[in-house]
Amino acid sequence: MSRRSIIEKKTIKSDPIYRNRLVNMMVNRILKNGKKSLAYRIFYKAMKNIKQKTKKNPLSILRQAIHRVTPNVTIKARRVGGSTYQVPVEIKSAQGKALAICWLLRASKKRLGRNMAFKLSYELIDAARDSGEAIRKKEETHRMAEANRAFAHFR
């Protein structure tokens, strides 16, 4: 029996302006080389741009975008008897949100545009409207999981 104690989950702090944990998760994923102030600047500029474009609350747009991109299932490679199967696995909401944020940021980096703030804002607006690269990634993952549903018993 293990003698290790149960590790407590770290609580995610909220950001200074919106006082929201999702915002802090997003900023931490934008972060590069420890430059958190730059990550905050990029994110807040993106939120300002969303407010100008949509005339709506940017925080609700962010929530809606993350909700629409969050996957229910993902696929894991599992090796059984010399062959590798793509096994569909249900994921928890926290992990789904983390994946959604990753996909949103990756899709916004691929976009053509002036700077990261503009690209991020347009990707968030598109995701809130159920279009864009991040939504396509979610649908592709769900399609793969559906196609490999026969291997679900390998979990």
Swiss-Prot record:
Location in or out of the cell: Plastid, Chloroplast
Record GO biological process: ribosomal small subunit assembly; translation
Superkingdom of the organism of origin: Eukaryota
GO cellular component, one term: chloroplast
Keyword Ribosomal protein: yes
Keyword Protein biosynthesis: no
Keywords: Chloroplast, Plastid, Ribonucleoprotein, Ribosomal protein, RNA-binding, rRNA-binding
PROSITE patterns: RIBOSOMAL_S7
Pfam family, one: Ribosomal_S7
Main location: plastid
A Gene Ontology molecular function term of the record: mRNA binding
Family according to the record: Belongs to the universal ribosomal protein uS7 family.
Reported function: One of the primary rRNA binding proteins, it binds directly to 16S rRNA where it nucleates assembly of the head domain of the 30S subunit.
Quaternary context: Part of the 30S ribosomal subunit.
Name of the protein described by the UniProt record: Small ribosomal subunit protein uS7c
The organism of origin for this protein: Physcomitrium patens (Spreading-leaved earth moss)
